[in-house]
Amino acid sequence: METEKKNSKEVALKHLAFVRIATIHILASVSNLYEYAKQNSGPLKSAVEKVEGAVTTVVTPVYQKFKDVPDSLLVFLDHKVGEVSYKFDEHAPPMAKKVVNQAHVLIYKATEKAQSFVKEARTGGPKAAFNYAATEYKFFVVTNSVKVWAKLNQYKPIHAMGDKALPVAAHFSSRYNDLVTDMTNMGYSLVGYLPLVPVDDIVKAYEKEDARRKKGGDTAGKKGETTDAADGDKSSSDSE
């Protein structure tokens, strides 16, 4: 009976399965980080274990009573999402469907990243997991922020504001990086988990993106000039 109930829940979660997966991964990450902090708490370890025991005694009966509620609620919400999705697919314009599909892709990618983060935490410990997260953060910031800024920078008001704001942002980002590096070298190991702002990489990526856009504009301009010249020659030929 329990197996049938479990299978029916798994089949029912057609839209929100990623929520359950993400929750499991988050709980696993928090558990690993808590265990790491407890093992490295030094003289406070015994006090932490006493508090942990007291909390477990109080929370366990409550958990046993309500443990099935979140899953039942998730199944109910999943059914509602299914109804809304059907109506949306039936009546929504193509552009809206495209946006929703892109959101689904992002959610899928985020779930994959969460799985990789938990895997790193389990195999290499919290530091390896944070290093992985910092690498992914750096890649995301460099690629996506540069593309967005390159598009926005085409508008004159934003371009003028950016010329003033970017040097200030670069200055404070460098100050932040120096502070994190100095504190890490002084022995504050937890500070070493903080990601650095990849200022140089962002600048290089922006220059590359800007050059690519300018090259694309020049190519379009040359094509326009060629077309105009061809039209002019054709007009001259017709007049003769």
UniProtKB/Swiss-Prot annotation:
GO cellular component assignments: endoplasmic reticulum; lipid droplet; plant-type vacuole
Highest taxon above the source species: Eukaryota
Pfam families linked: REF
Stretch list, region Disordered: 208-240
Transmembrane segments: none
GO BP: cellular response to hypoxia; developmental vegetative growth; lipid droplet organization; pollen development; positive regulation of growth; positive regulation of response to water deprivation
InterPro entries reported for this sequence: REF
Family, similarity comment: Belongs to the REF/SRPP family.
The protein's name: REF/SRPP-like protein At1g67360
Source organism: Arabidopsis thaliana (Mouse-ear cress)
